[in-house]
Amino acid sequence: MHDELVWIDCEMTGLDLGSDQLIEIAALVTDADLNILGDGVDVVIHIDSTALSSMIDVVAEMHSRSGLINEVESSIVDLVTAESIVLDYINNHVKQPKTAPLAGNSIATDRSFIARDMPTLDSFLHYRMIDVSSIKELCRRWYPRIYFGQPAKGLTHRALADIHESIRELRFYRRTAFVPPPGPSTREIAEVVADLSGTPATPGDIDSAYERPNG
């Protein structure tokens, strides 16, 4: 069974796929229990001064405060090299393509830039994604005490630090919002399925609960 998760965070000059540029990408791989495998990678990508100067003020201030702009200007790494570095690290821990979901916070935006600029990396990842922000939004609606009690974020706006915070956040939700291992019994699962489908649970339902596809 392939249970690894590939955590990626990107920093860009903005959120417009038509004009903005990818300037930093970091990756960490975890196992199913959210243990980090290896040291991860954090790569700053060079872009020209024209692209940097086109950033809106709030983004330019954020990246200047974090030190990222200076690192972008001094970097000699292009997109192709950055993609290769990230894939080399991931391949050390994920041996089969299209088996590990992409994980992170509001990860759809990051994936859009990855798909545009790093298609080999994008195609290596499973099409499914695990978005921690989705769990956050559900907790806000269903378990507000958990939502308001979540760990404070550092807001560094640097890719690798943001991944560590996302992993910590999911660990928090696992311990507060999810049922503890090993989860409900087979009978309890069958009873919930029966309740949701409006039909009584039968012995066959209970016996076959382990065998149902999880799609």
From Swiss-Prot:
Compartments where located: Cytoplasm
Segments crossing the lipid bilayer: none
InterPro entries cross-referenced by the UniProt entry: Exonuclease_RNaseT/DNA_pol3 (IPR013520), Oligoribonuclease (IPR022894), RNaseH-like_sf (IPR012337), RNaseH_sf (IPR036397)
GO terms of molecular function: 3'-5'-RNA exonuclease activity; nucleic acid binding
Pfam families, per database record: RNase_T (PF00929)
Chain ranges of the Exonuclease domain: 5-170
Residues at the active site: 127
UniProtKB keywords: Cytoplasm, Exonuclease, Hydrolase, Nuclease
GO cellular component, one term: cytoplasm
Annotated S-S bridges: none
Enzyme Commission designation: 3.1.15.-
Family membership noted in the UniProt record: Belongs to the oligoribonuclease family.
Function: 3'-to-5' exoribonuclease specific for small oligoribonucleotides.
Protein name per the record: Oligoribonuclease
Gene: orn
